[in-house]
Amino acid sequence: MTIVDVITIDGPTASGKGTVAHKVADALGFHLLDSGALYRLVALASDRAGVGVQDVDTLAKMAARLDVKFGPDRVWLSGEEVSQTIRLEAIGNRASAIAVHQPVRDALTALQRGFRKLPGLVADGRDMGTVIFPDAPLKVFLTASVEARARRRYKQLIDKGISANIEDLLRDLEERDARDRTRAAAPLRPAEGAYRLDTSEMTVEEAVAQVLEWFAAVR
């Protein structure tokens, strides 16, 4: 049986894991799984359908039949490109509220594991190393101070032409962190054996280089 390499990069919102994962995947020629986008897609689809964030059964059914396609920096839901829409703060907050439900997470598990294909996979999220790919040869837990993360998220949104208030972002991040850490379903924590990387004072290039160095060492 062929073993497909997986690098998991977990961490809190706006820790830089998505950017680092994308660049690591590019450097290695690996596939990329943005698991957070899946929850955002469920959030968007359920919002459009008028489904409440506590309607767990309906949310889980929507997650199980999610019609999603990923491309370089792009994502489609039922044939409609929603790359920018799912990055709205309101959708992110809704996704965070939906992600606490175990049936929703279970519905997305098989879909996420299906991304594990040759030549390899870089998977970013919150439970990639703890739940989805616990056998990954390299697990990274990326973090940064909440202030650094708020500044990054503010810049990301402004660069995309989306209005933002840094005080509101800071408060939202603190609320999401608390929700992610304390939820019963797959709480945010470093996986066993994970390498921890604080990117508060690091450039993206430095973080990517460190992950690639670790991967070379564990292969």
From Swiss-Prot:
Assigned keywords, A-Z: ATP-binding, Cytoplasm, Kinase, Nucleotide-binding, Transferase
Signal peptide: none
Reactions accelerated catalytically: CMP + ATP = CDP + ADP; dCMP + ATP = dCDP + ADP
Binding locations of ATP: G11, P12, T13, A14, S15, G16, K17, G18, T19
Its EC number(s): 2.7.4.25
One Pfam family hit: Cytidylate_kin
SUPFAM superfamilies: P-loop containing nucleoside triphosphate hydrolases
Highest taxon listed in the record's lineage: Bacteria
Keyword Calcium included in the entry's annotation: no
Record GO terms (molecular function): ATP binding; CMP kinase activity; dCMP kinase activity
EC class of the enzyme, as a word: transferase
Single GO BP term: pyrimidine nucleotide metabolic process
Localization (cell): Cytoplasm
Cellular compartments per GO CC: cytosol
Family matches, as NCBIfam families: cmk
Similarity field: Belongs to the cytidylate kinase family. Type 1 subfamily.
Name of the protein this chain belongs to: Cytidylate kinase
